[in-house]
Amino acid sequence: MKIENYIRDIQGFPKEGILFKDITPLLNNVEARQECLSILVNSLKGQKIDKVVGAESRGFFFGMLLAQELKAGFIPVRKPKKLPFDIISASYELEYGTDSLEMHIDAIKKGDRVLIHDDVLATGGTAKAVCELVEKLGGEIVQCNFLMELTFLNGRKKIKEYPVFAALTY
């Protein structure tokens, strides 16, 4: 089964000039979703994972599935003011300006082996911010793991010190 057949291209979304990669057909197909999960899990080659960190919001879909499959905890990384407990935050650059991500301060313990997951590696800004959060709390990043990588945006350069895996590349 080719999981790329379940990624739909949407021209001009969310704005003109963007070709959006829509993962909802993949999420909606049990066999394609399971195949994708297997590819992501197999990329870890049996490494022990204590926590899976999923970036808001599309990183939550496979992040939770990965955590379940790996028998690991799941940690959501959210946009500002979405988490109810004490947090740490990291900022990252957008095309125009900056944004930040937050994680609960008790989410990771020193020495936890962490898998970071998001749906897309684009510019690498989000992934870099998530890595900073994990390391601030003493976690060891085992891999940054993505459903897709948009290689023309060179996002790997921002997270070059970590192992990176993408199930699909465009």
Curated annotation (Swiss-Prot):
EC number: 2.4.2.7
Protein family membership: Belongs to the purine/pyrimidine phosphoribosyltransferase family.
Function: Catalyzes a salvage reaction resulting in the formation of AMP, that is energically less costly than de novo synthesis.
Location of the protein in the cell: Cytoplasm
A biological-process GO annotation: AMP salvage
Annotated S-S bridges: none
Keywords noted in UniProt: Cytoplasm, Glycosyltransferase, Purine salvage, Transferase
Binding partners and assembly: Homodimer.
Name of the protein in its database record: Adenine phosphoribosyltransferase
One cellular-component annotation, GO: cytoplasm
InterPro entries: Ade_phspho_trans (IPR005764), PRibTrfase_dom (IPR000836), PRTase-like (IPR029057), UPRTase/APRTase (IPR050054)
Source organism, top-level taxon: Bacteria
Coiled coil start-end: none
CDD domains according to UniProt: PRTases_typeI
Pfam families linked: Pribosyltran (PF00156)
Major subcellular location class: cytoplasm
Record keyword tRNA-binding present: no
Catalytic activity: AMP + diphosphate = 5-phospho-alpha-D-ribose 1-diphosphate + adenine
Organism field: Flavobacterium johnsoniae (strain ATCC 17061 / DSM 2064 / JCM 8514 / BCRC 14874 / CCUG 350202 / NBRC 14942 / NCIMB 11054 / UW101)
GO MF entries: adenine binding; adenine phosphoribosyltransferase activity; AMP binding
Pathway: Purine metabolism; AMP biosynthesis via salvage pathway; AMP from adenine: step 1/1
